[in-house]
Amino acid sequence: KTVSGTLVKAADMYLQVADVVIFRSDILTITSGDAPSEDPKKPAAGRPAGNESTDQEATRSSELEIDPGAPGVFYLPMSGMVGLEMRPEEIEMIVAEADKRGDGQTIVLDIESGGGMVIEYILMAQTIVEYKKRHKFVAWVGEAISAAAATALACDRIVFKSNARLGAITMHSSGNPVSDETEERWITLLKGVLRTSGYSEHWARPMVRNDSWISYVRDPDTGDVEYFSSPQGIAGEVVLSNWTENCVLSADQGVDSGLAYGRADNKEQLAKVLDLPSWNDLGTGQKMHDTWHQTCVKCEEDIRKTTARLGMLGEYSEMVQLRKRIEIYKRWLRWWKKAPNQMLLLGIPSINQLEEMIEELQRELREGRG
């Protein structure tokens, strides 16, 4: 498809030609119309003859060849516990949708999470870092604590909601603090993620350890920000973490310190922050989110009910008990395939263990015990 007209606006993520908005990622070629046509007196197709001003406007126009399907924003809510409701699989799915539109898409992760499992964050960070090579990731942050904050820092841009909190990327093992050596490895990993996003490495240590310092000074003229890992005692220095607490940023702090790209409380405001003409959600991220959350709820409910049934099998004969146990364990195997994260957190025997348990019960049935 070719679009002709006067170039009205050239924004960061799109061009506006006449009244048509075209995303930069959609543009294949741009041709200047400064040179006269073969017959400058011949009116343009569909235009009345003698309309010189219209012809002159067409002469000054640019012609852009674009794909017929205009891409936009791919929105994915990410809420709940990191490693359970919030996981990398949905990121993979939304990227697959974006890939169909070509490179250069904008993927918005709407993050509302108090944290969770570190290993799952590592998988999510690796997923985001890999796909950032061809798409832009935006973290739209409300509550982003611990592993959720680290996920946001893996994105190219961070936009805060007014009630946002981001930080406190602490590590624990079964509720207990981890060793200093483990924390240092975690800090090194976080620094690497920050580099891929273009953020200062100064953020890593004070968000992980409460015995660290981060402050900054913003140049009032240029807006440039300089970060410090120790007190400077200079005019304008703003302290965010002071040796006694993990760094947790509010919306005001995130924006003023330069970590956040802007602030938005709804999708229309977010579109403006991202320099988009309007909000245009082209993916099915909301459905992905809702489907997975519903699966987690159904899984937990079913495990609770079937576990209760196991405790009430005493009223049946031994042969019936064996069959009902096999039925329940096979049901659990199906849930392992549908919701492995939930099954792990619920402490259900692994697939291998269940298969061995089923095999043993089937052997007892064959031998006719009971």
What are these regions (language model features)?
Residues 75-85, 108-115, 138-142, 171-181, ...:
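Second-shell loop/turn segments in exported
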Residues 84-105:
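A short, well-ordered alpha-helical element
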Residues 1-56:
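Conserved RNA-binding domains used in RNP assembly and mRNA/RNA metabolism
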Residues 64-90:
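STAS-typified acidic loop motif
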Residues 172-289:
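Charged, glycine-interspersed solvent-exposed loop segments at helix/strand-loop junctions
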Residues 21-24, 81-89, 115-122, 143-146, ...:
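Soluble non-cytosolic domains of exported or imported proteins
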Residues 33-63, 200-205, 209-229, 271-370:
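Intrinsically disordered, low-complexity segments enriched in small/flexible residues
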Residues 113-182, 186-189, 210-221:
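Glycine-rich beta-to-alpha active-site loop
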